[in-house]
Amino acid sequence: MAVQFEVLTGVDGARLAIATLDAPASLNALSLPMIEQLGTHLRAWAQDPAIVCVLLRGNGSKAFCAGGEVRQLVEACRAHPGEVPPLAATFFAAEYRLDYLLHHYSKPLLCWGHGHVLGGGMGLLQGAGVRIVTPSSRLAMPEISIGLYPDVGGSWFLSRLPGRLGLFLGLTGAPINARDALDLGLADRFMKEDQQDQLIDGLLQLNWQEQTTLQLNSLLKALEQEAREHVPAAQWLPRREQIDRVLDVSDPACAWRAIGQLEHQADVVLAKAAGTLLKGCPLTAHLVWQQLQRARYLSLGQVLQMEYAMSLNCCRHPEFSEGVRARLLDKDNAPRWHWPDIAQVPAAVVEAHFSKVWEGRHPLADLA
């Protein structure tokens, strides 16, 4: 199993459930079986009155979760050119249902987001009730580099960031550290890497029969106080004003050019982000622009329904397969995009990514 499940019993007989992503060789990238296992156990734990709290974490020092296992998806896309592969329809439906479940979980759900927290890993972290980051945390939605787009609810949480930071992070795939995550409302608590055992011990010592919220908050607060001096310096809020000015534009092509002009700036953080965009997928930039505009007033369920259509349509078009080939399979880092110029991406192609590609009722129609 690529996810390990265990249940520990606390001092008062209450039980703590722990789910550990256990595929460190792939940085705990989510495969369909892992997603299905998580969904099954989380639903069972929600119904078990003996389970009082859930902790979601990843094995290995490098990553909580570096995204979805897209290699298998691309193999399926290549086997079904121009179509929606059955694996894609199943994978994205299961993943988005899992994300929705996390956001609406009925019990305290903590997620330990150390190391790389990318793509699908962000979907898991953002769904947790207590999102914990560490000195090694690097959170990002880097889909611009592989011809996909920030999914797993990215439309929802990026569109709600201050100013135009969500648009910037979606377009550039730029990583944020723990301080950034706390500042932007993408994390709740900061702890050191070596405090996880203390956290588990503390959870097992709590009296889960009364004043649960107060006790849990006191535990988290105490651990965070111990770690306070290890919080890294902020990167993105100090640059927000400049980013807002740069992205005060009317369309994605202008945004592409405006960010691109930062590539040779002395500010290495902005320059690196600009370089990533300029090597990225122009179609993705259009999708990011559109998804954030459309998601602004949507519920999470509506966002995931929209993203389901987008993801299936990405599987029908060549950019996703080509991006994964260049970045993850052949690793030549030289993608040959079908539309290499952002100004030449047809508006009809962008719009088509939001259209249904299934018969009858939306497969995620029950997500409120």
Which functions belong to the PLM regions below?
Residues 192-277:
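Amphipathic alpha-helical blocks and their helix-capping loop/short-beta junctions
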Residues 129-150, 185-200:
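Gly/Pro- and small hydrophobic-enriched strand-loop and loop-to-helix capping segments
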Residues 102-146, 169, 173-174, 178:
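Glycine-rich beta-to-alpha active-site loop
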Residues 56, 69, 124-125, 180-181, ...:
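Hydrophobic/aromatic residues within transmembrane alpha-helices
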Residues 256-272, 277-368:
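Long, low-complexity C-terminal extensions of enzymes
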Residues 58-97, 147:
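Glycine- (often His-adjacent) and acidic-residue-rich active-site loop
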Residues 153-155, 160-215:
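Contiguous mid-protein beta-loop-alpha structural module that forms a pocket-lining wall or clamp
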Residues 1-57, 100, 368:
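Conserved CoA-thioester-binding segment of acyl-CoA-metabolizing enzymes
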